[in-house]
Amino acid sequence: MYAGFMRIGVISDTHGLLRAEVLAALQGCEHILHAGDVGDAAILDRLRAIAPVTAIRGNVDLDGACGELPETELIELAGRSLYLLHDRQALDLDPVAAGIAVVVSGHSHHPAMQWHKGVLYFNPGSAGPRRFSTPVSLGFLTITETAIEPRVVDLLPN
C-alpha cells in the first residue's frame, strides 16, 4: 500500500512552446504527464530535468521522436492506475471495468475535471500557445492514500 502523497504535474498541448511559467510551476512534482500535442521532443527532455515523464502523442505529433510516442499509456502512480489519451472522445475502454482511477486527456485546450462512477476525467487545458480565448493552463494531481485531488492552474491570468 502506498503511504504518503504524490504530486503529479499534468500538461497538454504545448505545441512546441514550453513557457518559463510551466517550468516554474512544475518544480517539486514527482512525475509529469504530458497528454499529447508535444510539438517538439526537446520539451520532454526539459521536463525530464524536473521529474520522470510519461507522454503520449497527439494529432500534431506526426514526425520524429514525438511521432514515436504511444497513442495511449496506462501507468500506475502512487498505487493508482492512470490512463492517458489525447482526445477523450477516442476513449475505447471502460475505465471502471479496467480499474482506472484517472483518465487524463488534452486536445480541446479547455481545462476540465469531472468525476463519473468514481473515475476522474481530467484535462489540464493547453500549456502552449494561447488559442482563441482559452486559458493557458496546466494541472496537478495530488494522490494520497484516501483521495485524488485535482487542480487546474491558469498560468497567465488576465
Predicted regions and their residues:
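Conserved beta-sheet core of the metallophosphoesterase superfamily
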Residues: 54, 81-83, 88-147, 151
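Short, flexible, glycine/charge-rich loop motifs used to bind or transfer phosphoryl groups or to couple energy/partner
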Residues: 19-24, 43-46, 72-73, 90-94, ...
